[in-house]
Amino acid sequence: MSRRKQGKPQHLSKREFSPEPLEAILTDDEPDHGPLGAPEGDHDLLTCGQCQMNFPLGDILIFIEHKRKQCNGSLCLEKGVDKPPSPSPIEMKKASNPVEVGIQVTPEDDDCLSTSSRGICPKQEHIADKLLHWRGLSSPRSAHGALIPTPGMSAEYAPQGICKDEPSSYTCTTCKQPFTSAWFLLQHAQNTHGLRIYLESEHGSPLTPRVGIPSGLGAECPSQPPLHGIHIADNNPFNLLRIPGSVSREASGLAEGRFPPTPPLFSPPPRHHLDPHRIERLGAEEMALATHHPSAFDRVLRLNPMAMEPPAMDFSRRLRELAGNTSSPPLSPGRPSPMQRLLQPFQPGSKPPFLATPPLPPLQSAPPPSQPPVKSKSCEFCGKTFKFQSNLVVHRRSHTGEKPYKCNLCDHACTQASKLKRHMKTHMHKSSPMTVKSDDGLSTASSPEPGTSDLVGSASSALKSVVAKFKSENDPNLIPENGDEEEEEDDEEEEEEEEEEEEELTESERVDYGFGLSLEAARHHENSSRGAVVGVGDEGRALPDVMQGMVLSSMQHFSEAFHQVLGEKHKRSHLAEAEGHRDTCDEDSVAGESDRIDDGTVNGRGCSPGESASGGLSKKLLLGSPSSLSPFSKRIKLEKEFDLPPAAMPNTENVYSQWLAGYAASRQLKDPFLTFGDSRQSPFASSSEHSSENGSLRFSTPPGELDGGISGRSGTGSGGSTPHISGPGPGRPSSKEGRRSDTCEYCGKVFKNCSNLTVHRRSHTGERPYKCELCNYACAQSSKLTRHMKTHGQVGKDVYKCEICKMPFSVYSTLEKHMKKWHSDRVLNNDIKTE
């Protein structure tokens, strides 16, 4: 379009090639064309050059029809600036005659024609030129970059009757083929003769104005601005994004006010982009040359015209990507050029680059899969998806067999820290002592913090757990049941525990490690303090050795209870010298007094050889063999050479009963060192309230075992040592006020309701009334059975059946574990039946 269509007045630039001064022309034009120009800032009017009629910019089609048929003005024939010397007589024919269109022009005319293409001189506007704009085309140019001389483009080619009507036909000068329209001629010239005149729109409307990329080489035409002439250095990487059509358009369009002066480096080109498929066909040498020589890259792009692309590619991101690279490295055969990397389209699954930031390294815990998974949190083995990456890491260990979490007290290993935490409760019975550093550098038990009383108990609970561990190892009937229960619980709770967060896992690791460290440090200190390894044949030191092994001698309650028990033993064994020895049995002589006890006496009483053997058993309860005392390596093992009689098994709990009674007695004598505000904060706070009239604890005195003998749960030793428990005593509530029916008679734990106590009591008795009908699973709680039944199948989900025992499973990994556990001798087939 001319500048008059944009509402701009005529302004002639200073040119050197005009043979006559232009001032006279300007003075003649200004009075005639005074009303042509719209206001300087108005851009929405089109003015006819002949009749001075204004048209809105939206009515450009009406303006074109006006120029074709209705405008009969004579101004277009009078003012002819920059004419050639004289038109030939052949060119003076009427417009109704056929017109031949030349495709080649001489280099002398190239300068003038290219200058006139910028809309400075001509007074006529050719209909074919308007049709090119109407169909989304730019003005055609020849192979040398000049405009193709279409009929009536300027006054020198059709001086008569151009504004009246369009020529009847157009003839190609190369093949002499006539055409009825200039548009058909342009299509013929581009498709048949290979001239690159315009760009075809794939998705746009024909009425959408497009800016075409001229195909001529711009080096020969001095009027065309160079590629890198818009204030950009030659070695700037942003020159790679400069397109010849856009540069020439910006250079001329910005100067004429057609386009808003937006910064070219941070706004995408309006309507057309680079075609990545054509750029990839360019050679590496051409791309390297284009990096350093933008004019050569201009030739490459013009020789390889590019089809239009939908405006979906974000150039601003690619500009930021190139922001840090000011120079291009030398090209190698295996490495794509910078331009190829720039123009490579974004992949659908890839993340677009931003500021050339390198991608983060992958997680160390997740092995890289052979093929990128569809979802980042899906298992590459079975395809199961997870919410959190930590759950995927834990689940992947079920396929790889990795078990990074190992118990410090036994050889148990698991895949989750929460499972290790649950396993540690079998050692601790849900009461692990918090460990702190004492003055001598050893880990000792400290008072629990508020709010942690349910999880943190006293060291005597750990003592009982070791006793129970010893019983389970020596009783063959308990081993399969406990082992199966633990493994079945692992299987049934796997799916629920996969939803736990990493913070909980980290916290549980820290607590479990502290508990294991305290027990191992106690074992190590027990061996180093003696100076010699305890042999298998050493017996008769059960109580002092337990004190040293569990680091209980430094705790005030256990130390006082220990003194009382030793004092009672001393009184019974030496009746004649009871008072004298009681004064000398102070803290310094406790270990020596325990060493002077005969091998045939336990707790100050005579006993049979079988009973002495059981007394020696209590000594071996926590000490273990010398080979198992290396820190953080093996479990606390008992000597296999020591054969335990079946009748002596219940005697192992006598030690625990005595300690429990002594602890309760010491709490009532004086203010305790560990102050508990509520009776529920200590497992032993209400144990003294369950006392019978003879002073013995209820749970430690079954019927028929009060009259002598160490076998069973005898509490005579503890009853004799605590004669004051029968009365309320100072600071102790009465038995009616303090007694509660929801207190466990085995460990003294207090519950809010009786149903919880009933379930808890089954952990001591081993009762499991809820059994699965499909497998041998049994549990003490109905909710656990309900959760377990979900592992066998749920409504609306696939069920995987074992081919051997036909047991159903809802998760395939659970079936794999079942096959490894029960049918490890058979190979698991891949074609598992699903229903």
Curated annotation (Swiss-Prot):
Q: Where is the composition biased (Gly residues)?
A: 706-720
What does gene deletion cause?
Germline biallelic loss of Bcl11a leads to perinatal lethality. Bcl11a +/- mice have a significantly decreased brain volume, affecting both gray and white matter. The limbic system (hippocampus and amygdala) is among the brain regions that are more severely affected. Bcl11a +/- mice display normal novelty-seeking behavior but show long-term social memory defects, impaired sociability, and increased physical activity. Bcl11a +/- mice show dynamic postnatal transcriptional dysregulation in the brain.
Q: According to its UniProt record, where is this protein mainly located? A: cytoplasm
Acidic residues bias spans: 482-506
Description of post-translational modifications: Sumoylated with SUMO1.
**Residues engaged in binding Zn(2+) 3:** 772, 775, 788, 792
Put simply, this protein is called: BCL11 transcription factor A
Q: Which organism is it from?
A: Mus musculus
Q: What is the lineage of its organism?
A: Eukaryota, Metazoa, Chordata, Craniata, Vertebrata
Q: Which gene encodes it?
A: Bcl11a
